[in-house]
């Protein structure tokens, strides 16, 4: 029994692997780097048709995302093409609108409610301190004060400021009359 020699048979079975040259390695590295840089969608991907949908559906449909409405648009204006809108026909019976009616208050109650309004008091305090209000708040204050004036006129209530001014004028006249410089 002869034994085969290990070294001779192994060399015959194995073929020598060719090593890549430096130039080939550099070229492959450049290609890998270029492929790595270019990621994302390819140029013009919107205009390319999707082949998978065409094959499955059996119908020829263009799935272009740029295409919008399929409605034809008339480019020229013709007299016959102008369509006048028809007025809506009114129902024979008037339809009653269901509106949640606010409970009506007497002018006295409404005036008392407006005078005791905390928001109005706070905004008036801010105005007195010299702050400027936003346009929305200012318009609300103006409307509320106008409503208070209207209610006071309806109820016949006058502001007490006029009486105080008249009393001050009377005091000034009395002081002027008693002034000794005027007597000369």
UniProtKB/Swiss-Prot annotation:
Sequence segments annotated as region (Disordered): 1-106, 159-184
Oligomer and partners: Interacts with Der.
Bias type Acidic residues, positions: 159-169
Keywords per UniProt: GTPase activation, Ribosome biogenesis
Name this polypeptide is given: Der GTPase-activating protein YihI
Its biological purpose: A GTPase-activating protein (GAP) that modifies Der/EngA GTPase function. May play a role in ribosome biogenesis.
Biased composition (Basic and acidic residues): 8-32
This protein's encoding gene: yihI
Native species: Pectobacterium atrosepticum (strain SCRI 1043 / ATCC BAA-672)
Keyword Metal-binding: no
HAMAP family noted in UniProt: GAP_YihI (MF_01058)
GO molecular function annotations of the record: GTPase activator activity
Family: Belongs to the YihI family.
Biological process, per Gene Ontology: ribosome biogenesis
């Amino acid at each position: 029994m002869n034994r085969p020699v290990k070294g001779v048979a192994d060399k015959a079975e194995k073929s020598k692997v060719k090593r890549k040259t430096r130039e080939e390695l550099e070229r492959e590295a450049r290609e890998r780097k270029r492929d790595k840089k270019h990621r994302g969608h390819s140029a013009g991907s919107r205009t390319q048709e999707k082949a998978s949908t065409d094959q499955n559906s059996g119908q020829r449909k263009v799935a272009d995302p740029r295409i919008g409405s399929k409605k034809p648009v008339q480019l020229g204006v013709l007299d016959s093409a102008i369509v006048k809108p028809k007025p809506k026909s009114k129902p024979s019976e008037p339809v009653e609108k269901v509106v949640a009616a606010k409970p009506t208050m007497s002018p006295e109650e409404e005036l008392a409610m407006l005078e005791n309004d905390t928001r109005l008091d706070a905004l008036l305090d801010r105005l007195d301190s010299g702050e400027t209000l936003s346009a929305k708040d200012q318009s609300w204050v103006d409307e509320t004060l106008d409503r208070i004036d209207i209610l006071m006129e309806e109820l016949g209530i006058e502001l007490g400021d006029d009486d105080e001014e008249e009393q001050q004028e009377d005091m000034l006249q009395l002081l002027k009359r008693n002034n000794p410089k005027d007597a000369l």
